Amino acid sequence: MNLPITNHDLSSEASAKAESPITPASPLTGSCPLPISDYREIVLAHGSGGKLSQQLIQKIVVPQFRNELLEPLHDGAIFSLNGARLAFSTDSFVVSPIFFPGGDIGKLAVHGTVNDLSMCGARPLYLSAGFILEEGTSMEDFWRIVLSMREAAAEAGVTLVTGDTKVVDRGKADKIFINTSGIGVVPDGVDIAPGRARVGDKVIVSGEIAVHGMAIMSVREGLEFETEIASDTAPLNRLVESILAAAPDVHVLRDPTRGGITSALTEIAQTAKVGIRLDEVQIPISEEVKGACEILGLDPLYVANEGKLLAIVPAESANAALTAMRTHPLGSKAAVIGEVVADHPEFVTMRTRVGGTRVVDMLSGEQLPRIC
Protein backbone atom coordinates (compact mmCIF):
# COMPACT_ATOMS: atom_id res chain seq x y z
CA MET A 1 0.00 0.00 0.00
CA ASN A 2 1.55 3.33 -1.05
CA LEU A 3 0.77 6.37 1.05
CA PRO A 4 1.75 9.69 -0.56
CA ILE A 5 1.85 11.38 2.80
CA THR A 6 4.59 13.48 4.35
CA ASN A 7 6.51 11.65 7.07
CA HIS A 8 6.11 13.54 10.33
CA ASP A 9 9.09 11.92 12.10
CA LEU A 10 11.13 14.95 13.12
CA SER A 11 14.17 13.13 14.49
CA SER A 12 16.31 13.03 11.31
CA GLU A 13 17.99 16.40 11.73
CA ALA A 14 18.73 15.81 15.38
CA SER A 15 20.00 12.28 14.65
CA ALA A 16 22.67 13.68 12.36
CA LYS A 17 24.08 15.61 15.28
CA ALA A 18 24.09 12.59 17.56
CA GLU A 19 27.26 11.17 15.93
CA SER A 20 29.45 13.75 17.62
CA PRO A 21 30.29 13.42 21.33
CA ILE A 22 28.30 15.40 23.85
CA THR A 23 29.86 18.80 24.51
CA PRO A 24 28.90 21.56 26.93
CA ALA A 25 26.02 23.62 25.68
CA SER A 26 27.07 26.69 23.75
CA PRO A 27 25.42 30.11 24.15
CA LEU A 28 22.08 30.27 22.37
CA THR A 29 23.07 32.70 19.65
CA GLY A 30 21.21 31.02 16.77
CA SER A 31 17.60 31.28 15.76
CA CYS A 32 14.81 29.22 17.30
CA PRO A 33 14.51 25.90 15.40
CA LEU A 34 10.72 26.20 15.30
CA PRO A 35 9.60 28.87 12.82
CA ILE A 36 8.49 31.95 14.75
CA SER A 37 6.09 32.67 11.92
CA ASP A 38 4.20 29.54 12.99
CA TYR A 39 4.26 29.92 16.78
CA ARG A 40 5.66 32.93 18.58
CA GLU A 41 4.36 31.55 21.88
CA ILE A 42 3.62 28.21 23.48
CA VAL A 43 0.03 27.14 22.82
CA LEU A 44 -2.07 24.50 24.57
CA ALA A 45 -1.60 22.11 21.65
CA HIS A 46 2.13 21.93 22.46
CA GLY A 47 1.08 19.84 25.47
CA SER A 48 -1.40 17.60 23.65
CA GLY A 49 0.86 14.63 23.02
CA GLY A 50 0.40 15.14 19.26
CA LYS A 51 2.48 16.62 16.45
CA LEU A 52 3.16 19.95 18.16
CA SER A 53 4.33 18.20 21.33
CA GLN A 54 6.64 16.07 19.20
CA GLN A 55 8.02 19.14 17.43
CA LEU A 56 8.61 20.95 20.71
CA ILE A 57 10.57 18.01 22.11
CA GLN A 58 12.44 16.95 18.98
CA LYS A 59 13.34 20.41 17.70
CA ILE A 60 14.05 22.38 20.87
CA VAL A 61 14.64 20.08 23.84
CA VAL A 62 16.32 16.90 22.58
CA PRO A 63 19.15 18.52 20.57
CA GLN A 64 20.35 20.38 23.67
CA PHE A 65 20.54 17.29 25.89
CA ARG A 66 21.13 14.45 23.42
CA ASN A 67 22.64 11.32 24.95
CA GLU A 68 22.25 7.56 24.67
CA LEU A 69 19.80 7.35 27.57
CA LEU A 70 17.53 10.08 26.22
CA GLU A 71 17.77 8.97 22.58
CA PRO A 72 15.10 6.19 22.70
CA LEU A 73 12.46 8.67 23.96
CA HIS A 74 10.99 5.88 26.06
CA ASP A 75 8.59 6.38 29.00
CA GLY A 76 11.73 6.45 31.14
CA ALA A 77 15.50 6.10 30.96
CA ILE A 78 16.94 2.61 31.49
CA PHE A 79 20.54 2.30 32.71
CA SER A 80 22.87 0.05 34.69
CA LEU A 81 24.35 0.97 38.06
CA ASN A 82 26.54 -1.36 40.11
CA GLY A 83 25.20 -4.37 38.27
CA ALA A 84 21.52 -3.44 38.58
CA ARG A 85 19.34 -2.29 35.68
CA LEU A 86 17.29 0.70 36.75
CA ALA A 87 14.52 2.75 35.17
CA PHE A 88 14.00 6.44 35.97
CA SER A 89 11.00 8.53 34.92
CA THR A 90 9.29 11.83 35.65
CA ASP A 91 5.88 13.32 34.89
CA SER A 92 3.93 16.48 35.69
CA PHE A 93 0.19 16.79 36.28
CA VAL A 94 -2.00 19.83 35.68
CA VAL A 95 -5.41 18.19 35.27
CA SER A 96 -8.51 20.36 35.67
CA PRO A 97 -10.66 19.80 37.65
CA ILE A 98 -8.40 18.47 40.40
CA PHE A 99 -11.18 16.12 41.61
CA PHE A 100 -13.09 14.04 39.08
CA PRO A 101 -15.11 10.81 38.97
CA GLY A 102 -12.75 7.95 39.74
CA GLY A 103 -9.85 9.98 41.05
CA ASP A 104 -8.03 13.23 41.64
CA ILE A 105 -4.77 14.90 40.67
CA GLY A 106 -2.89 13.20 43.52
CA LYS A 107 -3.91 9.68 42.60
CA LEU A 108 -3.17 10.47 38.95
CA ALA A 109 0.31 11.73 39.83
CA VAL A 110 1.25 8.51 41.62
CA HIS A 111 -0.29 6.23 39.01
CA GLY A 112 1.25 8.16 36.13
CA THR A 113 4.85 7.70 37.18
CA VAL A 114 4.29 4.14 38.41
CA ASN A 115 2.89 3.35 34.97
CA ASP A 116 5.72 5.04 33.09
CA LEU A 117 8.22 2.90 35.00
CA SER A 118 6.10 -0.17 34.33
CA MET A 119 6.15 0.55 30.58
CA CYS A 120 9.93 0.17 30.81
CA GLY A 121 9.37 -3.30 32.25
CA ALA A 122 10.55 -2.08 35.65
CA ARG A 123 9.26 -2.86 39.12
CA PRO A 124 8.56 0.61 40.60
CA LEU A 125 10.12 1.23 44.02
CA TYR A 126 10.47 4.88 45.02
CA LEU A 127 8.80 8.18 44.12
CA SER A 128 9.40 11.87 44.68
CA ALA A 129 6.68 14.52 44.67
CA GLY A 130 6.85 18.22 43.94
CA PHE A 131 3.85 20.45 44.69
CA ILE A 132 3.22 23.90 43.19
CA LEU A 133 0.36 25.43 45.17
CA GLU A 134 -1.61 28.56 44.36
CA GLU A 135 -2.14 30.95 47.25
CA GLY A 136 -5.75 30.59 48.40
CA THR A 137 -6.09 26.89 47.57
CA SER A 138 -8.25 25.09 50.11
CA MET A 139 -6.19 23.38 52.81
CA GLU A 140 -8.88 20.70 52.94
CA ASP A 141 -8.41 20.01 49.23
CA PHE A 142 -4.64 19.72 49.64
CA TRP A 143 -5.13 17.35 52.57
CA ARG A 144 -7.48 15.16 50.53
CA ILE A 145 -5.00 15.04 47.66
CA VAL A 146 -2.09 14.05 49.91
CA LEU A 147 -4.18 11.30 51.51
CA SER A 148 -5.14 10.07 48.05
CA MET A 149 -1.48 9.93 47.05
CA ARG A 150 -0.68 7.90 50.16
CA GLU A 151 -3.41 5.40 49.31
CA ALA A 152 -2.33 5.20 45.67
CA ALA A 153 1.30 4.60 46.64
CA ALA A 154 0.29 1.84 49.05
CA GLU A 155 -1.83 0.20 46.36
CA ALA A 156 1.07 0.26 43.90
CA GLY A 157 3.61 -0.91 46.48
CA VAL A 158 5.86 2.14 46.15
CA THR A 159 7.29 4.53 48.73
CA LEU A 160 7.40 8.31 48.46
CA VAL A 161 10.85 9.23 49.79
CA THR A 162 11.49 12.89 48.93
CA GLY A 163 9.70 15.99 47.69
CA ASP A 164 9.34 19.75 47.51
CA THR A 165 6.62 22.36 47.96
CA LYS A 166 6.34 25.83 46.44
CA VAL A 167 3.54 28.42 46.75
CA VAL A 168 2.85 31.06 44.09
CA ASP A 169 0.66 34.17 44.09
CA ARG A 170 -3.07 33.98 43.45
CA GLY A 171 -3.73 33.70 39.74
CA LYS A 172 -0.21 32.43 38.98
CA ALA A 173 -1.29 28.76 38.99
CA ASP A 174 -4.57 26.85 39.04
CA LYS A 175 -4.90 25.49 42.59
CA ILE A 176 -2.27 22.73 42.44
CA PHE A 177 0.22 21.24 40.01
CA ILE A 178 2.17 18.09 40.91
CA ASN A 179 5.37 16.56 39.55
CA THR A 180 6.35 13.01 40.43
CA SER A 181 9.56 11.17 39.57
CA GLY A 182 10.26 7.52 40.19
CA ILE A 183 12.87 4.82 40.08
CA GLY A 184 12.45 1.08 39.62
CA VAL A 185 14.39 -2.10 38.92
CA VAL A 186 14.26 -3.82 35.52
CA PRO A 187 14.34 -7.63 35.90
CA ASP A 188 16.96 -9.67 34.06
CA GLY A 189 15.87 -10.75 30.61
CA VAL A 190 13.35 -7.93 30.13
CA ASP A 191 14.08 -5.79 27.06
CA ILE A 192 11.21 -3.43 26.31
CA ALA A 193 11.60 -0.36 24.11
CA PRO A 194 9.55 1.43 21.44
CA GLY A 195 12.14 0.60 18.79
CA ARG A 196 11.73 -3.16 19.26
CA ALA A 197 8.42 -3.57 17.40
CA ARG A 198 8.88 -6.16 14.64
CA VAL A 199 6.87 -7.08 11.55
CA GLY A 200 4.39 -9.81 12.48
CA ASP A 201 3.97 -8.68 16.09
CA LYS A 202 0.44 -8.37 17.46
CA VAL A 203 -0.91 -5.18 19.03
CA ILE A 204 -2.95 -5.69 22.20
CA VAL A 205 -4.85 -3.12 24.27
CA SER A 206 -5.66 -3.99 27.88
CA GLY A 207 -9.25 -2.70 27.87
CA GLU A 208 -11.80 -0.10 26.81
CA ILE A 209 -10.23 3.09 25.51
CA ALA A 210 -10.85 6.82 26.08
CA VAL A 211 -12.37 6.43 29.55
CA HIS A 212 -10.22 8.91 31.48
CA GLY A 213 -10.48 11.68 28.94
CA MET A 214 -14.24 11.43 28.74
CA ALA A 215 -14.57 11.31 32.54
CA ILE A 216 -12.79 14.67 32.68
CA MET A 217 -14.74 16.17 29.79
CA SER A 218 -18.08 15.00 31.16
CA VAL A 219 -17.41 16.99 34.34
CA ARG A 220 -16.20 20.05 32.44
CA GLU A 221 -19.19 20.06 30.10
CA GLY A 222 -21.77 19.09 32.73
CA LEU A 223 -22.82 15.97 30.84
CA GLU A 224 -24.87 13.36 32.68
CA PHE A 225 -25.25 9.77 31.55
CA GLU A 226 -27.31 6.86 32.79
CA THR A 227 -24.03 5.32 33.96
CA GLU A 228 -21.40 7.76 35.24
CA ILE A 229 -18.13 7.72 33.33
CA ALA A 230 -15.37 7.34 35.93
CA SER A 231 -11.67 7.68 35.19
CA ASP A 232 -9.79 4.44 34.61
CA THR A 233 -6.70 5.70 36.47
CA ALA A 234 -4.94 2.73 38.04
CA PRO A 235 -1.43 1.41 38.75
CA LEU A 236 -0.48 -0.99 35.97
CA ASN A 237 2.63 -2.54 37.55
CA ARG A 238 0.89 -5.72 38.74
CA LEU A 239 -0.71 -6.18 35.32
CA VAL A 240 2.69 -5.79 33.66
CA GLU A 241 4.18 -8.37 36.02
CA SER A 242 1.47 -10.83 34.97
CA ILE A 243 2.08 -10.14 31.28
CA LEU A 244 5.85 -10.59 31.56
CA ALA A 245 5.46 -13.79 33.55
CA ALA A 246 3.36 -15.25 30.73
CA ALA A 247 5.18 -13.63 27.79
CA PRO A 248 8.69 -12.49 28.78
CA ASP A 249 9.52 -11.67 25.15
CA VAL A 250 7.17 -8.67 24.98
CA HIS A 251 8.73 -6.11 22.64
CA VAL A 252 6.93 -2.86 23.52
CA LEU A 253 4.70 -1.54 26.30
CA ARG A 254 3.13 1.91 26.24
CA ASP A 255 0.42 3.62 28.29
CA PRO A 256 -1.61 5.70 25.81
CA THR A 257 -2.23 8.82 27.87
CA ARG A 258 -2.27 12.22 26.10
CA GLY A 259 -3.07 11.77 22.43
CA GLY A 260 -4.70 8.37 22.99
CA ILE A 261 -3.82 5.09 21.34
CA THR A 262 -3.23 6.66 17.93
CA SER A 263 -0.47 9.00 19.07
CA ALA A 264 1.20 6.26 21.10
CA LEU A 265 1.18 3.80 18.20
CA THR A 266 2.38 6.43 15.72
CA GLU A 267 5.38 7.17 17.95
CA ILE A 268 6.17 3.45 18.10
CA ALA A 269 5.84 3.07 14.32
CA GLN A 270 8.16 6.01 13.73
CA THR A 271 10.75 4.82 16.24
CA ALA A 272 10.80 1.21 15.01
CA LYS A 273 10.49 2.17 11.31
CA VAL A 274 7.53 -0.17 10.84
CA GLY A 275 3.89 0.12 9.87
CA ILE A 276 1.00 -0.69 12.19
CA ARG A 277 -2.41 -1.80 10.95
CA LEU A 278 -5.43 -1.63 13.28
CA ASP A 279 -8.89 -3.17 13.00
CA GLU A 280 -11.54 -0.71 14.19
CA VAL A 281 -14.04 -3.47 14.96
CA GLN A 282 -11.67 -5.03 17.49
CA ILE A 283 -10.96 -1.84 19.49
CA PRO A 284 -12.95 -2.02 22.76
CA ILE A 285 -14.95 1.06 23.74
CA SER A 286 -17.95 1.36 26.06
CA GLU A 287 -21.29 2.67 24.83
CA GLU A 288 -21.17 5.52 27.38
CA VAL A 289 -17.77 6.70 26.18
CA LYS A 290 -18.76 6.31 22.54
CA GLY A 291 -21.88 8.38 23.17
CA ALA A 292 -19.97 11.10 25.02
CA CYS A 293 -17.44 11.32 22.19
CA GLU A 294 -20.23 11.68 19.64
CA ILE A 295 -21.91 14.45 21.65
CA LEU A 296 -18.64 16.39 21.96
CA GLY A 297 -17.42 15.63 18.45
CA LEU A 298 -14.29 13.81 19.64
CA ASP A 299 -12.51 10.81 18.16
CA PRO A 300 -11.94 8.23 20.93
CA LEU A 301 -8.73 7.07 19.24
CA TYR A 302 -7.15 10.35 20.37
CA VAL A 303 -8.66 10.55 23.87
CA ALA A 304 -6.44 9.99 26.92
CA ASN A 305 -6.33 6.81 28.98
CA GLU A 306 -4.81 6.48 32.46
CA GLY A 307 -5.36 2.82 33.30
CA LYS A 308 -4.76 1.08 29.99
CA LEU A 309 -1.69 -0.17 28.20
CA LEU A 310 -0.68 -1.19 24.71
CA ALA A 311 1.49 -4.29 24.31
CA ILE A 312 3.30 -5.23 21.12
CA VAL A 313 4.10 -8.90 21.33
CA PRO A 314 5.55 -11.57 19.01
CA ALA A 315 2.71 -13.44 17.32
CA GLU A 316 3.63 -16.72 19.00
CA SER A 317 3.31 -15.10 22.46
CA ALA A 318 0.14 -13.09 21.81
CA ASN A 319 -2.30 -15.66 23.18
CA ALA A 320 -0.28 -16.08 26.37
CA ALA A 321 -0.08 -12.32 26.89
CA LEU A 322 -3.79 -11.87 26.14
CA THR A 323 -4.78 -14.63 28.56
CA ALA A 324 -2.61 -13.11 31.29
CA MET A 325 -4.28 -9.74 30.77
CA ARG A 326 -7.80 -11.13 30.80
CA THR A 327 -7.23 -12.97 34.09
CA HIS A 328 -6.22 -9.68 35.77
CA PRO A 329 -8.94 -7.21 36.89
CA LEU A 330 -7.32 -4.37 34.93
CA GLY A 331 -7.17 -6.39 31.71
CA SER A 332 -10.46 -8.28 31.67
CA LYS A 333 -11.52 -6.62 28.39
CA ALA A 334 -8.17 -6.88 26.65
CA ALA A 335 -8.22 -7.44 22.89
CA VAL A 336 -5.88 -7.90 19.94
CA ILE A 337 -6.52 -4.78 17.86
CA GLY A 338 -3.90 -4.96 15.13
CA GLU A 339 -0.50 -6.03 13.94
CA VAL A 340 2.88 -4.69 12.91
CA VAL A 341 3.38 -4.73 9.13
CA ALA A 342 6.10 -3.99 6.59
CA ASP A 343 3.79 -1.77 4.53
CA HIS A 344 3.64 2.01 5.02
CA PRO A 345 6.57 2.21 7.51
CA GLU A 346 6.20 4.89 10.20
CA PHE A 347 2.44 5.15 9.66
CA VAL A 348 -0.59 3.69 11.40
CA THR A 349 -3.58 2.67 9.29
CA MET A 350 -6.93 1.28 10.32
CA ARG A 351 -9.43 -0.97 8.62
CA THR A 352 -12.76 0.73 9.29
CA ARG A 353 -16.08 -0.82 10.23
CA VAL A 354 -17.29 -0.47 6.65
CA GLY A 355 -14.24 -2.19 5.19
CA GLY A 356 -12.23 0.83 4.07
CA THR A 357 -8.75 1.86 5.16
CA ARG A 358 -7.67 5.19 6.56
CA VAL A 359 -4.49 6.66 7.97
CA VAL A 360 -4.70 7.52 11.66
CA ASP A 361 -2.03 10.11 12.35
CA MET A 362 -1.18 12.28 15.33
CA LEU A 363 -3.35 15.35 15.83
CA SER A 364 -1.81 18.72 15.10
CA GLY A 365 -4.18 20.57 17.41
CA GLU A 366 -5.60 20.00 20.89
CA GLN A 367 -8.70 17.89 21.51
CA LEU A 368 -8.59 17.89 25.30
CA PRO A 369 -6.36 20.38 27.12
CA ARG A 370 -5.15 19.67 30.67
CA ILE A 371 -6.43 16.11 30.72
CA CYS A 372 -3.66 14.79 32.98
Per-range role (PLM):
Residues 2-13, 18-372:
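Helix-biased detector of long, well-ordered alpha-helical tracts
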